[in-house]
Swiss-Prot record:
PANTHER family with a match to the protein in the record: 30S/40S RIBOSOMAL PROTEIN S3, SMALL RIBOSOMAL SUBUNIT PROTEIN US3C
Positions of the KH type-2 domain: 39-107
Keywords, comma-separated and alphabetical: Ribonucleoprotein, Ribosomal protein, RNA-binding, rRNA-binding
Protein name: Small ribosomal subunit protein uS3
Family, as annotated: Belongs to the universal ribosomal protein uS3 family.
Gene: rpsC
GO annotation, biological process: translation
């Protein structure tokens, strides 16, 4: 079922982390969750042209901390920080608590799944051919270090009457492997023919240990016994006596029945039998 489950939710607490980090009791949980959804929708509309890939919401005691990951942080901050102050005021009204806004830059937007999906959606809204947009995004991702990428588009592609689904893949995209660092993003393109959905999977490598990538020349972490306990070793397969008996290097050889020491002497003293000529016994018998 690797194709059906959400790749990020499948890898939570293994490789991925939650986008909302806070705790609440049963009564206040629905309201806080609704606030998070409204904040994300507001930021998606407000920062549509700022290339926002991810939004992380944290709630310390009676405060809120929002971290925005963007490939264009200058667009979010604005001139002398004017835009970010307006954004902070709007978020405080929306959440009802003091809000701290942090901006983090995405170094490689070409291998960020959400940014790839948003970019393809913007191109489809500008009437660019969907195959050209998908293949160009795949080439850029593979050129900048992605080990695999898969892009799927669904809807009335090119304005046809019957909706269909097309997808392209390059490299490896292991959906079932938990240690695979798989990035996933979804976006929608609102065209004149209807809504076209875009899904993107980007495989960045396998994580072996703590932040170690496969093929980096480091071995996998070994599991050691607790302190104070002796190491359990595998018992020997053969007893020590049998191993010593066969240490002469003749183990496995088949040995015949033992002969006495006098057998060689007897064979030397016995006279050899003369061969019987054919026809002598026949004449005597006649």
């Amino acid at each position: 079922m690797g194709q059906k489950i959400h790749p990020t939710g499948f890898r939570l607490s293994v490789l991925k982390n939650w986008s909302s980090k806070w705790y609440a009791n049963g009564k206040s949980f629905p309201g806080m969750l609704n606030e998070d959804i409204k904040v994300r929708e507001y930021l998606k509309k407000k920062l549509a042209h700022a290339s926002v890939g991810r939004v992380v919401i944290e709630r310390p005691s009676k405060n809120a901390r929002i971290t925005i990951y963007s490939s264009r942080p200058g667009v979010v901050i604005g001139k002398k920080g004017e835009d970010i102050e307006v954004l902070r005021g709007a978020l405080q009204k929306l959440m009802g608590v003091p809000v701290h806004v942090n901006i983090e830059e995405i170094r490689k937007p070409e291998i960020d799944a959400q940014l790839i999906a948003d970019n393809i959606a913007q191109q489809l809204e500008k009437r660019i051919m969907f195959r050209r947009a998908m293949k160009r995004a795949m080439q850029n991702a593979m050129r900048l270090g992605a080990q695999g990428i898969k892009i799927m588009s669904s809807g009335r592609l090119n304005g046809i009457e019957i909706a269909r689904t097309e997808w392209y893949r390059e490299g490896r995209v292991p959906l079932h492997t938990l240690r695979a660092d798989l990035d996933y993003g979804v976006s929608e393109a609102k065209t004149t023919y209807g809504v076209i959905g875009i899904k993107v999977w980007v495989f960045k490598g396998e994580v072996i240990g703590r932040g170690e990538q496969a093929g980096a020349g480091t071995a996998a972490p070994q599991v050691l016994p607790p302190a104070g306990e002796p190491e359990t070793r595998r018992p020997p397969r053969r007893p020590a006596g049998r191993a010593d008996a066969r240490s002469d290097g003749k183990a496995g050889e088949k040995k015949g029945p033992r002969k006495s020491d006098n057998s060689s002497e007897e064979s030397a003293t016995k006279p050899a039998k003369k061969p019987v000529k054919p026809g002598v016994n026949d004449a005597a018998a006649s």
